[in-house]
UniProtKB/Swiss-Prot annotation:
<comment type="subunit">
    <text>Associates with BCL10 by CARD-CARD interaction.</text>
</comment>
<feature type="disulfide bond" description="Redox-active">
    <location>
        <begin position="7"/>
        <end position="77"/>
    </location>
</feature>
<feature type="transmembrane region" description="Helical">
    <location>
        <begin position="122"/>
        <end position="142"/>
    </location>
</feature>
<keyword id="KW-0812">Transmembrane</keyword>
<comment type="function">
    <text>Plays a role in inhibiting the effects of BCL10-induced activation of NF-kappa-B. May inhibit the phosphorylation of BCL10 in a CARD-dependent manner.</text>
</comment>
<keyword id="KW-0256">Endoplasmic reticulum</keyword>
<feature type="domain" description="CARD">
    <location>
        <begin position="8"/>
        <end position="99"/>
    </location>
</feature>
<dbReference type="InterPro" id="IPR011029">
    <property type="entry name" value="DEATH-like_dom_sf"/>
</dbReference>
<dbReference type="InterPro" id="IPR042146">
    <property type="entry name" value="CARD_BinCARD"/>
</dbReference>
<keyword id="KW-0496">Mitochondrion</keyword>
<protein>
    <recommendedName>
        <fullName>Caspase recruitment domain-containing protein 19</fullName>
    </recommendedName>
</protein>
<keyword id="KW-0472">Membrane</keyword>
<keyword id="KW-1015">Disulfide bond</keyword>
<dbReference type="GO" id="GO:0005789">
    <property type="term" value="C:endoplasmic reticulum membrane"/>
</dbReference>
<dbReference type="InterPro" id="IPR043574">
    <property type="entry name" value="CARD19"/>
</dbReference>
<dbReference type="GO" id="GO:0031966">
    <property type="term" value="C:mitochondrial membrane"/>
</dbReference>
<keyword id="KW-1133">Transmembrane helix</keyword>
Amino acid sequence: MTEQTYCDRLVQDTPFLTSLGRLSEQQVDRIILQLNRYYPQILSNKDAEKFRNPKLSLRVRLCDLLGHLQRSGERDCQEFYRALYIHAQPLHSCLPSRHALQNSDCTELDSGNASCELSDRGPVAFLTCLGLAAGLALLIYCCPPDPKVLPGARRVLGFSPVIIDRHVSRFLLAFLTDDLGGL
């Protein structure tokens, strides 16, 4: 899948950004001032005054600004997104192009029909499995060794220190020390 350019993203996000109530006048003014002050090659003083003209409606000024940036090029669109992130971060995270990018990243990683989440069972299922594993480990650890009941358990536990952290492996190795001669 090809990368989506910032200009393409701005074309996709323009209807969302210009809809009523998305950006306040103060946020638009801050974005314009940032583009004008830090990047005067993007917005000259004359352009900044035009886009901050209070006689025009906010929607018209924003449409003009976005059109100007789309015509200016990729770097200008990228700086607009940076200014939008700084001055309107909650809105930046809701942009349609960001959702499209996140969904495309997930589909590239997935086999196609699986979801992006690791598990949808929740924390109760995790705690249940953790409790079950801890209970079984405690049962094996505390029960007196009876070779007739669990003949292969000590062999399995003998290989688990390779996988488990060194702090836990000390306890497993101490458990195995009395029966290593039987391997």
